[in-house]
Regions:
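Nucleic-acid-interacting cores, centered on viral/eukaryotic replication and modification enzymes
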Residues: 1-202
Length: 202
């Protein structure tokens, strides 16, 4: 089989194996996960000793625990990952969740997780695609998901004009796949508004 990087770049192979692989390439996620797994286990052990945990899904990393342990442990983790995997922390994409203000000792460059809604900051974050935070934060992000699905349904309607049965089959399959995940993992009271909005759009 031809290297995927060559297929994506007009037959020209770029880089060395040690420099990584193409983002979005099918094996990239698995290779990434294996590459930093030893360091992830060490990080988890450190925070687990004080009641915390470190979990990762592909390149999404979540660490919880007392700030005086989490912040130094995360800095050590990223220093080791940089040395072993040549991966750098993107601080602009790293957030700290707190119900109140940013905790004392928060490393520079890390923002508070949440969204500004109607002039009020609502703490929250996305955990494996599921919004977690204040009720306002959760409902806002579920509404965004419904609008995303609605845009896709509109595209289906535009492409399949006049094909009623095909439109219903594809639109239903698409919405079920997109929203079932949220239906199974969000509180029913949070999903109710989003589900009613989806019903109205359909």
């Amino acid at each position: 089989l031809a290297p995927s990087s060559a297929l994506e770049h007009g037959g020209h192979v770029w880089g060395e194996a040690g420099e990584g692989t193409t983002q979005g390439d099918p094996p990239a996620g698995a290779l990434f996960s294996v590459a930093w797994h030893p360091q992830l286990r060490e990080l988890d052990a450190k925070v687990a000793a004080v009641g915390g945990a470190a979990r990762a899904g592909m390149d999404d990393l979540y660490v919880c625990g007392p700030r005086e342990v989490v912040f130094p442990a995360v800095e050590v983790f990223w220093a080791e990952v940089l040395q072993v995997c040549q991966l750098q922390l993107e601080r602009s994409k790293t957030e700290v969740f707190s119900w109140g203000e940013l905790p004392a000792g928060t490393p520079p460059g890390l923002a508070r997780a949440g969204t500004l809604l109607e002039g009020v900051f609502q703490p929250g974050f996305i955990l494996y695609g599921i919004p977690v935070g204040t009720p306002e934060y959760v409902k806002h992000h579920l509404s965004l998901k419904v609008k995303e699905v609605a845009r896709e349904v509109e595209q289906v309607l535009d492409v399949l004009k006049g094909e009623g049965q095909a439109i219903w089959t594809i639109a239903r399959a698409s919405t079920v796949m997109k929203l079932d995940y949220h239906l199974s993992l969000c509180y029913p009271t949070d999903m109710e508004v989003a589900a009613r909005e989806m019903d109205r759009l359909l």
